[in-house]
């Protein structure tokens, strides 16, 4: 599984992402906010999204080798990205495994890690944790002074939030934006 900041080459997964969010909202019955493909594309184009992709023949790649954080980018990643852009997509047979994006409020003083979703067939493999970690790194990279939060109704994400050092706070303390 490769977890990376989403870019233009990942726009093609917007429909899959929306379908997975919709299916999960029906299954969980907890009011997961559905998103449109246009909204997902907007987040991807703005550099405010993280995507996980399953890449055949790379299943044995260690998580650290397969993940690329913004602050770890260096020239190795830049040259890899340039090659991928020149060749179109990195792998034509890669498969959507998960996604998350960030939102900012209060003059960029508050940043939410939102929309965390993992495709059914990749659940229970640690994909959500890798996405969550990359989303946090991206949030800190883009908004270094912001308070980062994660709103969730799911027990698994609550547990992850605790492990990442998030603390529970009332919604009224987060931001005054509508």
Positions of predicted regions on the chain:
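Intrinsically disordered, low-complexity terminal tails and inter-domain linkers enriched
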Residues: 56-93
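Conserved GNAT acetyl-CoA-binding A-motif
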Residues: 139-153
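Conserved catalytic-core motifs of GNAT/GCN5-like acyltransferases
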Residues: 151, 165-178
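A short beta-loop-alpha structural element at the N-terminal edge
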Residues: 1-16
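Conserved active-site tyrosine of GNAT-family acetyltransferases
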Residues: 161-163
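Extended, composition-driven regions rather than compact fold-specific motifs
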Residues: 156-159, 178
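Conserved acetyl-CoA-binding loop-helix of GNAT-fold acetyltransferases
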Residues: 118, 124-139
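A conserved beta-strand-loop-helix scaffold within acyl/acetyltransferase catalytic domains
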Residues: 18-57, 92-120
């Amino acid at each position: 599984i490769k977890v990376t900041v989403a870019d233009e080459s990942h726009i093609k997964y917007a429909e899959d992402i929306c379908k997975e969010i919709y299916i999960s909202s029906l299954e969980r019955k907890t009011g997961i906010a559905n998103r449109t493909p246009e909204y997902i594309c907007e987040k991807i184009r703005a550099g405010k999204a993280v995507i996980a992709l399953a890449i055949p023949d790379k299943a044995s790649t260690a998580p650290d080798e397969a993940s690329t954080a913004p602050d770890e980018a260096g020239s190795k990643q830049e040259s890899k990205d340039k090659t991928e852009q020149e060749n179109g997509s990195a792998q034509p047979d890669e498969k959507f495994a998960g996604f998350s994006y960030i939102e900012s409020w209060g003059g960029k003083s508050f940043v939410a890690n939102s929309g965390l979703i993992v495709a059914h067939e990749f659940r229970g493999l640690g994909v959500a944790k890798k996405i969550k970690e990359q989303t946090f790194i991206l949030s800190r990279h883009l908004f270094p002074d912001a308070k980062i939060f994660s709103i969730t109704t799911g027990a698994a994400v609550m547990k992850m939030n605790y492990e990442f050092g998030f603390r529970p706070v009332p919604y009224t303390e987060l931001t005054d934006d509508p």
